[in-house]
Design a protein with these regions (language model features):
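Cofactor-binding beta-sheet edge motifs in enzyme active sites
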Residues: 1-287
Length: 287
């Protein structure tokens, strides 16, 4: 976002994280809103910085600010053959201000919640909604209850994909998180004591558990997102859970309403169905 607005190569942008001495307070990364909120804040900061640099370039090139363009890190006024490099413009700007500091911020806009006041936690209203569709292919071993995810297909609407490789990786990570929630991760208690209090019993998926994941990035344009972007996180996590249970129901004819769908629960459900079938009176033919 910053590089796009300033017309710079991405390698010039360095992100400083976790240093409260030089960056403002941040409430954290959650609620599938970071690209939307941080992206818009960065967009505003970049535009403020662009105004500073444009004015400096105008002084150096003896032109009007509105005539200044920056292409390939070279500032030019109109059809001038010779322009000023990014370094020259920054040097010119430093003469006026010393260290150049700009800020940008973003607050949830009223349109996000129907123009009305909203109540709840301090995270604010939802700015935009993403959409995700998922297909999960599974194999179920009815002798052991083990469910194996063979392949996952995901289509995720993230608005404008600012970085397609990052979006693809984010969606894949969301599928893994959904796998953990749906298949193995459980905060189980017995007599008030947590019995899954270590990483052996509270099992999270590893790369060994990962099936092939085919990601389809569906681009749309959110009118309030930075360059039209939305989230690419929890949407693909949430879609895995019902897709998995529907796939299991299709495979063995048993629907699960409790998560995680562990092997013991699958085996118990299969045994329960078998015992019920044995107890039910057999149908006999007759006239």
């Amino acid at each position: 976002t910053v590089a796009e607005v300033l017309g710079l190569d991405l390698s010039r942008v360095r992100v400083v994280t976790g240093d409260s001495e030089v960056v403002p307070k941040d409430n954290g990364s959650y609620s599938s809103r970071v690209t939307f909120m941080v992206g818009n804040a960065a967009l505003e900061a970049a535009r403020n910085l662009k105004a500073v640099l444009t004015n400096a370039a105008a002084r150096k090139l003896e032109a009007r600010p509105e005539d200044i363009e920056c292409l390939g890190e070279v500032y030019r006024a109109g059809k001038q053959d010779k322009g000023a490099t990014f370094e020259e413009v920054v040097t010119e700007a430093l003469k006026d201000t010393g260290t150049i500091t700009v800020t940008g911020n973003y607050s949830t806009i009223p349109e996000s919640h129907g123009g009305k006041k909203y109540r709840g936690s301090a995270i604010g209203g939802t700015m935009g909604y993403s959409y995700s569709a998922q297909v999960v292919e599974v194999s179920v071993d009815e002798e052991t209850g083990v469910v194996t995810v063979d392949k996952v297909w995901v289509a995720h609407d993230c608005g404008k994909a600012l970085n397609r490789l990052t979006v693809e990786g984010q969606v894949q990570g969301s599928v893994w998180m959904g796998m953990g929630q749906a298949m193995s991760e459980e905060a189980a208690y017995h007599d008030g004591l947590m019995v899954t209090a270590n990483m052996l019993d509270y099992r999270v998926p590893t790369i060994q558990d990962s099936p092939p994941i085919e990601v389809g990035i569906v681009e749309s344009n959110d009118p309030h997102g930075p360059f039209g972007a939305k989230e690419a996180g929890e949407g693909s996590l949430a879609a895995f859970l019902p897709a998995l249970t529907n796939a299991i129901a299709d495979a063995i004819g048993i629907r699960f309403n409790d998560l995680p769908v562990t092997p013991d629960r699958v085996f118990e459900a299969i045994e329960k169905r078998r015992r019920a079938a044995e107890k039910s009176p057999k149908k006999t033919g007759g006239a």
